């Protein structure tokens, strides 16, 4: 005996969804206002009429704003924005660091023997008070030059290292990893410099 299956009993395995799209909708859903030609009158304004102008929330446009509400800017020669001759050619100072510190002395040849002796005396007397920063400000030099002229005493170096080790205990894992990578990069650079020489 043969059984035949009618097509009406067959159900599709996958569900196919069809979209009914209306292809006739306009490209711009909201129609734009026609542009107002230049020189055309928007409204008749007399002395007796009172006008209320509510501008749109957009950048001001001279073609749309009525002449009554336009701002008459003062001429350039009347504006209070005249610059001095020095500041006309220089950009504005961004921060305190960008201000020039005067003529700094970078080498030991620029220091006199009296300056070198006084730096060494002050550094050995009180290294906590006379740091490289304070001495560089006093003698108008760089901190590197101060450290070349006179090194800090061993007790001061040991104290600074102990403070730094105490700060390291508060570091997180990310900061430790960044510092380790920086140290390895610096070591690699010094090896490269030695290899080039």
Swiss-Prot record:
Coiled coil feature spans: none
Keyword Chloroplast: no
GO biological process: mitochondrial translation
Transit peptide (residue range): 1-20
Any one of the GO CC terms: mitochondrial large ribosomal subunit
Annotated source species: Schizosaccharomyces pombe (strain 972 / ATCC 24843) (Fission yeast)
Cited Pfam families: MRP-L20
Compartments it resides in: Mitochondrion
GO terms, molecular function: structural constituent of ribosome
Protein name: Large ribosomal subunit protein mL58
Key word Mitochondrion present: yes
Keyword vocabulary terms for this entry: Mitochondrion, Ribonucleoprotein, Ribosomal protein, Transit peptide
Recorded name of the encoding gene: mrpl20
Superkingdom of origin organism: Eukaryota
Role: Component of the mitochondrial ribosome (mitoribosome), a dedicated translation machinery responsible for the synthesis of mitochondrial genome-encoded proteins, including at least some of the essential transmembrane subunits of the mitochondrial respiratory chain. The mitoribosomes are attached to the mitochondrial inner membrane and translation products are cotranslationally integrated into the membrane.
InterPro entries named in the record: Ribosomal_mL58 (IPR024388)
Record-stated family: Belongs to the mitochondrion-specific ribosomal protein mL58 family.
Subunit structure comment from the entry: Component of the mitochondrial large ribosomal subunit (mt-LSU). Mature yeast 74S mitochondrial ribosomes consist of a small (37S) and a large (54S) subunit. The 37S small subunit contains a 15S ribosomal RNA (15S mt-rRNA) and at least 32 different proteins. The 54S large subunit contains a 21S rRNA (21S mt-rRNA) and at least 45 different proteins.
